[in-house]
């Protein structure tokens, strides 16, 4: 009986050790893959379009504000010209949320 118990403890110990090594190998592979993806993303990054500048060439290129990304908003200006104009703008509800978070940060921090 003691032999079976000793053999069981040894088997559980070996199994836990081997599974821990496999998990370490998987974690290392995931970290390497994540780092390579981040490097590719940084190399692929392009200049963003500042607020109130023309974004008609790329509607997803607007810069980020402190918390939220600006949105490319298109409209037709008054004056009879039928040409669409697109600029990067911050929606009002997001502007108010940023102001509120700034006030809260100033109050507590």
Swiss-Prot record:
Gene Ontology terms: cellular component: extracellular region
Tissue pattern of expression reads: Expressed by the venom gland.
Q: Name one GO molecular function term.
A: toxin activity
Q: Which UniProt keywords apply?
A: Disulfide bond, Knottin, Secreted, Signal, Toxin
Signal peptide location: 1-20
Which residues are removed as the propeptide when the protein matures? 21-44
Primary localization: secreted
Record-annotated disulphide pairs: 48-63, 55-72, 62-88, 74-86
Q: Give the subcellular location.
A: Secreted
> Pfam family of this protein, just one?
Toxin_35
| The record's note on its domains | The presence of a 'disulfide through disulfide knot' structurally defines this protein as a knottin.
Family as reported in the entry's similarity comment = Belongs to the neurotoxin 19 (CSTX) family. 01 subfamily.
Please state what the protein is called: U3-lycotoxin-Ls1x
- Please give the organism: Lycosa singoriensis (Wolf spider)
Lineage runs:
Eukaryota, Metazoa, Ecdysozoa, Arthropoda, Chelicerata
């Amino acid at each position: 009986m003691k032999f079976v118990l000793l053999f069981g403890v040894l088997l559980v110990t070996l199994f836990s050790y081997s599974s821990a090594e496999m998990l370490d190998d998987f974690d290392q592979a995931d970290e390497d893959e994540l780092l390579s993806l981040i490097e590719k993303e940084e190399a692929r990054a392009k200049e963003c379009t500042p607020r109130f500048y023309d974004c008609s060439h790329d509607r997803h290129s607007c810069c980020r504000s402190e918390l939220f990304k600006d949105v490319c908003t298109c409209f037709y200006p008054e004056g009879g010209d039928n040409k669409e104009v697109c600029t990067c703008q911050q929606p009002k509800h997001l502007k108010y949320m940023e102001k509120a978070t700034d006030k809260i940060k100033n109050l507590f921090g």
